[in-house]
């Protein structure tokens, strides 16, 4: 039977003394005079499976006693077992780290607690050769080096664990919202609006910008083209969509429209930011999960966010315990304990922005970023609150309206908005959300104050004109969640093929 290494490690007793077929890649091999040991991994499980290969030579059978002994041995053999078909010299020639193999053999228990079972190989076939230039030889490699070979690094123990956890977390999020009665929707990748108001968007165009206003061969043409672009003198009516368009930074506005018809929705897809930052926290392409809920206020929004996070943590601990245990030992001490504690927390703390600011100002800690009312919290502030002061996740609510987006609902004090950020240890802000402004006149006034053209968002205002209601939602940066779940500290290490400033290889 053809099975995976994960199947064997989870329930080895089902396969003892049975002939099985495995495919995988060589992680390591060791040679003795009459034995070859192969560490095989197929990507389904953290640990390698040991394959033992030994050459069996056929003995000449001459006497009646030898004939009888031969037949008795055949009876003792399981009916699945057959003589080895292995030539050690030929096997040694084809074995290289990274090669892909198919192995047929019998799973046998051992007396070694470190290797409780192994495959006694009967046949080994080379599926894909490798050679000495394969960069993942059996030694320790830095993460910086592995980022240069993102197409191969998933074959390491570390990144195999990371991307198995990513898979579990991805489907756990879908599972949570489906169980809660949410509808999954697909929001546009190409958009004409800047939902976040940050202005750091990737623009799309079919116009030949290099030819504006003249060809590059003419002196100063590039400079003139840049000036033309900066003066906004390009006629985008001649472009594909007849206007400026961008890669989306959020699907929130469209999700609001869908929620005000389907009640509860979520979108989960790639988003793009053209931030020229080369830090461990920034990527140009990343994934966002954004739920939107009609008839939902801020406190209900917080409850959904907490339940979602705890559900995902529990699923990852259940399905990827060995992977997280490995990361606990190699990347972040006490990771399992921290995740368990958070998954079992009854109710996350909720603190107002002003209270958080006061805690930081009275901390006697020297921060690089200034603290004053109206200042956004920097990562160092967020980590102080979650790691030093509260030592647990905390919701920061009721933020100054000047530093939050136009669509967030004004509080009665008219100074703050019904916004929330969920801060967690090691990461800082994990989730950002708010109750949305449902009052049409207030929303128009806020757009005017922030100089947001009303004509571009008439459709968004229609959501308030026609049957508007209180509604709320939030955004979860998926890669930040993965940093939190894995104990890693760089966004480039939780995305298979990261796109960052001045870096796009694959």
Swiss-Prot record:
One GO term of the biological process aspect: asparaginyl-tRNA aminoacylation
Broad class of the protein's primary localization: cytoplasm
Subcellular location: Cytoplasm
Signal peptide coordinates: none
Keyword set, alphabetical order: Aminoacyl-tRNA synthetase, ATP-binding, Cytoplasm, Ligase, Nucleotide-binding, Protein biosynthesis
Gene3D superfamilies from the UniProt entry: Bira Bifunctional Protein, Domain 2, Nucleic acid-binding proteins
GO molecular function, one term: asparagine-tRNA ligase activity
Domain of life: Bacteria
InterPro entries hit by this protein: Aa-tRNA-synt_II (IPR004364), aa-tRNA-synth_II (IPR006195), aa-tRNA-synth_II/BPL/LPL (IPR045864), Asn-tRNA-ligase (IPR004522), Asp/Asn-tRNA-synth_IIb (IPR002312), NA-bd_OB-fold (IPR012340), NA-bd_OB_tRNA (IPR004365)
EC number: 6.1.1.22
GO cellular component: cytoplasm
Reaction(s) catalysed (UniProt annotation): tRNA(Asn) + L-asparagine + ATP = L-asparaginyl-tRNA(Asn) + AMP + diphosphate + H(+)
Pfam families membership: tRNA-synt_2, tRNA_anti-codon
PANTHER family given in the database record: ASPARAGINE--TRNA LIGASE, MITOCHONDRIAL-RELATED (PTHR22594:SF34), ASPARTYL/LYSYL-TRNA SYNTHETASE (PTHR22594)
Family, similarity comment: Belongs to the class-II aminoacyl-tRNA synthetase family.
Assembly mode: Homodimer.
Protein known as: Asparagine--tRNA ligase
Originating species: Onion yellows phytoplasma (strain OY-M)
Gene name as annotated: asnS
